[in-house]
Amino acid sequence: MNGQGRLLTHFLKNADKLVIPVYQRNYDWKEEHCKKLYSDLVKTIRDNKRWHFFGGIVSVSDPMGSSSDYLVIDGQQRITTVSLLLLAIANLIKDGLVTPNDPNLYDVITKKYLVDEINPKQRKMKLKPIKGDQDAYDRLWGDPSEYNFSSRITQNYLFFYNQIQREDISVDQLFTAVEKLQIIDITLTPPDDDPQLV
């Protein structure tokens, strides 16, 4: 087991795929958790903080995938929530509802943090939630009339989508705050570490 402090965005960027194992629970963060994260990000911007600690992420290389595919053992709620926030920013830009100062921000977010760059034309998403959440997450990439509104995935995505439009901070500032999220990245080494015992 190896642990090191690093930025969450480095963790996301260096992974081709982040798989939530079938034995994990469904995504269950409530809106209050998203409000807290959003408030922390805004405070990071306003206080000009160098970083904001965001907890630990425990992962192990996926034996069924490439060396850059990881099973997320602990931290799936945080990874999923940040992915929803990033997708909300990207979709707001795509929908023309916000205009970033950086004209490349949409591509930076989608290609580095949301989509597997090796297969961008096939739109292979980096995050692979468990089956109960996968459909709701996939629908967020398409027509809003097809969203699964009963899913927490969708509800929290919509919270971010709407909140960003109400704030007086720019999406560039918000993305910069996301880049300041610091994690403890704990990587398990099989067979010594059993992911199901963590």
Regions inferred by a protein language model and the residue ranges of each:
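Glycine- and hydrophobic-rich flexible loops that cap the catalytic core of alpha/beta enzyme folds
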Residues: 1-197
